[in-house]
Design a protein with these regions (language model features):
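Short, internal strand/loop/helix patches
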Residues: 25, 98-134
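Sec-dependent N-terminal signal peptides
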Residues: 4-14
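Thiol-/selenol-based redox modules, centered on thioredoxin-like
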Residues: 128-164
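A short beta-strand-turn-helix
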Residues: 27-47
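Structural microenvironment flanking redox-active thiols in thiol-disulfide oxidoreductases
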Residues: 61-102, 113-119
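Sec/Tat signal peptide C-region and signal peptidase I cleavage site
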Residues: 16-20
Length: 164
């Protein structure tokens, strides 16, 4: 019995670890309701950062503000930042107003049923971000955000882009 439980725990732990390391494609609507294929974004980029957020999440908004600057700095070098909102369907206009008011130019997608978020994270903590390289490998995962984290994230992006 102990062997069986240990084996099941090992298999579950391995499956969770593998899931966290896998990149997978998905399609979500943008703020105008147009379907956007994440696979197409990854195919045309060298490095992509996915960031899951919600309008009620203050650290999420702080991360987005810092990432907007990093996005502008490296987007011409193959970097793409994609913000994926997890608010419910009723909040789409609120999300759109927030993004417009901030002047953000990066793609914002809506994951109102949280399926993509759960597929990547498996947790309910935000912000939750993953950095994906040109080989479509998840090379970094970040949970939460505090001032100063953007320096580490920028260094990871630069390294993935091959910038010294």
């Amino acid at each position: 019995m102990k062997k069986t439980i240990f084996l099941l725990l090992f298999v579950f732990a391995f499956a969770t670890l593998s899931k966290a390391q896998m990149y997978y494609e998905f399609t979500l609507p943008d703020l105008d309701g147009n379907d956007v294929s994440f696979g197409k974004i990854v195919d045309k980029s060298n490095v992509v950062m996915l960031s899951f957020w919600a309008t009620w999440c203050t650290p999420c908004k702080e991360e987005m503000k810092k990432m907007a600057d990093i996005y502008e700095k490296y987007k011409g070098q193959g970097f793409e930042y994609v913000a994926i909102n997890n608010d419910n369907q009723k909040s789409v206009s609120k999300v759109k107003s927030f993004i417009t008011a901030q002047g953000y130019t990066f793609p914002v997608l809506m994951d109102t049923d949280k399926k993509v978020f759960e597929g990547y994270s498996g947790k309910d903590e935000m912000p939750y971000s993953v950095i994906i390289n040109k080989k479509k490998e998840i090379i970094s995962v970040h949970t939460g955000f505090k001032t100063g984290d953007e320096v580490m994230i920028e260094n990871e992006i630069k390294a993935a882009l091959g910038i010294k």
